[in-house]
Amino acid sequence: MIFSTLEHILTHISFSIVCIVITIHLITLLIDEIIKLNNSSEKGMIATFLCITVLLVTRCIYSGHLPLSDLYESLIFLSWSLSFIHIVPYFKKNKSHLSTITASSVIFTQGFATSGLLTEIHQSAILVPALQSEWLIMHVSMMILGYAALLCGSLLSVALLVLTFRKNRNLLCKKNPLLLKLTEEFSFGEIQYINEINNIFGNASFFSDNNYYRSQLIQQLDYWSYRVISLGFIFLTIGILSGAVWANEAWGSYWNWDPKETWAFITWIVFAVYLHTRTNTNLQVENSAIVASMGFLIIWICYFGVNLLGIGLHTYGSFTLTSN
């Protein structure tokens, strides 16, 4: 009873703090001069990380196993992973644009985990025999860490695409204001093509101060997106391989083409394509960003969408799971 009450308190404290943090982030995005608020938001995320850490430890103590056995616990661990990714640049004194994305991701996952949709599986249950293995820690933790990193990297790529489109659109409109309304009908590739033609014929200077800042921001987004996705890809690979070994021990086969396994493989393929296009110097940065943006949807289908089906070998922790 005490552990359950403590867990309930920590869950809502962490959610409340992260709500305040995301509000501060939105304010600092509008007013860059408020440095104290920015520092407060970073300290708030550290407090959120500590609350979620204590929450996981508490649940581990009274359940007798690492809290990774169902959808609720995996969502809490996903929030912890996103919080960890958020505070790493802070301790390295390296300011990045990852913070706004990770903070918003934490509030989404933490909010959903504490919502009424998962009420049936908030209480810890005894592990089914198939999950009573040392591979549970290795496989699930690597997969969740991989999901967290890939989600953050994918969102950075989405932001990169938005900024690139706006930059190309603004450049085109500055060179010919009459095309302001027409650009809304152009595709991303068409706008880039028109900008290249305008540059060939020697129009006005390519970069204004605003466009220069935007170009620098795009480069930073690409830098962090590539590195975070690379880290997530490593975690995902380790998670899939450890899961295959565990499956062979539990079911006598390394691969069964279970829905979760199939979508995990699709996720791996998508981000392998991303890494290939990103390292290919003949391709533009936007090409790899488009692949990563597609990967964002694939991850949610793999992680969350398959649980809605309630079929296959990975049905533990779906909405139909109840406490024993």
Curated annotation (Swiss-Prot):
Subcellular localization: Plastid, Chloroplast thylakoid membrane
Membrane topology: Multi-pass membrane protein
Source superkingdom: Eukaryota
Keyword field contains Membrane: yes
Pfam families named among the record's database cross-references: Cytochrom_C_asm
Function of the protein: Required during biogenesis of c-type cytochromes (cytochrome c6 and cytochrome f) at the step of heme attachment.
HAMAP family for the chain: CytC_CcsA
Name this polypeptide is given: Cytochrome c biogenesis protein CcsA
